[in-house]
UniProtKB/Swiss-Prot annotation:
It catalyses: a UDP-3-O-[(3R)-3-hydroxyacyl]-N-acetyl-alpha-D-glucosamine + H2O = a UDP-3-O-[(3R)-3-hydroxyacyl]-alpha-D-glucosamine + acetate. Its cofactor is Zn(2+). This is UDP-3-O-acyl-N-acetylglucosamine deacetylase. Its EC number is 3.5.1.108. Zn(2+) binds at H78, H237, D241. It comes from Burkholderia cenocepacia (strain HI2424). Belongs to the LpxC family. InterPro entries: Ribosomal_Su5_D2-typ_SF, UDP-acyl_GlcNac_deAcase, UDP-acyl_GlcNac_deAcase_C, UDP-acyl_N-AcGlcN_deAcase_N. Pathway: Glycolipid biosynthesis; lipid IV(A) biosynthesis; lipid IV(A) from (3R)-3-hydroxytetradecanoyl-[acyl-carrier-protein] and UDP-N-acetyl-alpha-D-glucosamine: step 2/6. GO terms for molecular function: metal ion binding; UDP-3-O-acyl-N-acetylglucosamine deacetylase activity. It holds the Pfam family LpxC.
Amino acid sequence: MLKQRTIKSIVKTVGIGVHSGRKIELTLRPAAPGTGIVFSRVDLPTPVDIPASAMSIGDTRLASVLQKDGVRVSTVEHLMSACAGLGIDNLYVDVTAEEIPIMDGSAATFVFLIQSAGIEEQNAPKRFIKVTKPVEIRDGDKFARLDPYFGFKLKFSIDFRHPAVDKTGQELEVDFATTSYVREIARARTFGFAHEAEMLREIGLARGGSMDNAIVLDEYRILNNDGLRYDDEFVKHKMLDAIGDLYVIGHPLLASYTAYKSGHGLNNALLRELLAHEDAYEIVTFDDPQAAPKGFAFDAQTAFA
């Protein structure tokens, strides 16, 4: 059977919170089959566990934020994206603040941590959410959509109308049957505009944001000396975000995702719309790994990645 996965050993790192600017400790721990991805605020007098789920996402203005009883864990999308890319079903994520450290602004550090810990198959069938009917959410000209597809593919279009972004790819289509998440998506960094960063700092946000963890643009150009990691890094990062946003549903999706100018809020609304229609999806497992879509019947160390 195609099995669930966790990590083999505990792994730790320290990074900066993009909004608080503070040093944050992050610990990843193995979890039993059926646990899911569970975030734990271990800095509180009594630690609070917040399982990743579509219904636990609250604030989505600047990141995907998990909330439970007034306790928050922000900026979960890059770590969730790495878990999706490496096929991690079960994981405890201990964090000492209300945000996951930003690291280099991509998912690459989290991929490295998980691969360093080692990936272990578990004696339980991996559960997929198979989309059986189209589901769509629109907001003005923005939209996000899921269609039935035996596999996982994404098509994302952006439109920032900025000279530096316009010169790069504005549209990307990826099918993980034939594309490596680790090589092609994981290293794409978040990006932002210098004038927006100043405004955010004035209201106490983005205190940890810098060219060490983001692509920074002024009105005309990229300010980072080292340029881009991919020719189409902007749209690739939006896809990286979408993969993480979608993975909070708790299982990998078997679906085709299409989006135009979507963000964390629209992605979460799409998941809620899917879950609201029980006839639009079903839970499936694969007794024979070879019967799973290409890209999911991976060996123990890689991903649809």
